[in-house]
Amino acid sequence: SITGKEVVLGGSSKLLAKSDRSGGKILVGGDWQGKEGTRQAVFTTVEKGALVDASADKVGDGGTVVVWSDIKNPKSKTIAQGKFLAKGGSTRGDGGKIETSGYYLLTHGIKTSVKSMNGKSGEWLLDPYNITIGSSASGTAFNDNDPGNDTYTSSATSEVLASDISSALENGHVTIQTGGSAGDGNGDGDIIVSASISKSGGGDKTLTLKAHNDVTINSSISSSSSDLDLVLWSDSDANGSGGVNLNSNLSTNGGNVWLGGGSGSASWQSLTVGNGNS
């Protein structure tokens, strides 16, 4: 693991935790969901061109990659713009898991793969405070200066490109979740889709949007290649204030669609969904 208050991996950096039989575990700025007692960074940056790879080469499951900063600290940020891999073995083995999380999160141009050639796909998890899935960078959350010199806008919303989500869905499942119980209270834990997400390759995949408050779909979500299961999960604290606002088309190419809420989880059509009203 690599951690500290400020962690920066430059564009020529390579972190590898690979073997013929399994992928390893690479932690940058913290552990999965901030657990296991690993120190949590405040500023974590993985620049474009950097490679973080915890794949299995031949047999076995892909490993774990985490790029993290403290999601409970309103001044924390994660910039993840490199290439992140946790693929299953080429002969057999399931895909691994990748997490990129921070109170503010910027992932423009990120490349991820948790695919498996002969097993189950893995998952890419994004866990910021508020997030907009858009078509371009607005720069509202933070600038790209060195970590110690950045300026912050406490009410800013994290950003991920719809094109990056579209590409990632060809190589694994994607989960975006938000939390509104921590931080400075200037965000509600919303997820807003403001640019179209279109899966055009790969096998059956799942896109889960799980918001502490609202999930708002203002642009289409579609698949033209295999099934795309959609889980649109609002009000994950079950306080009754969140909902799913569907203002555009969903086209799943035969996949399932679940809309609802709940603070706990349930199983429906082999998907993990909320245990509230749906």
Where are the regions that the model predicts?
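Extracellular and secretory-pathway beta-repeat/beta-biased strand scaffolds
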Residues: 1-278
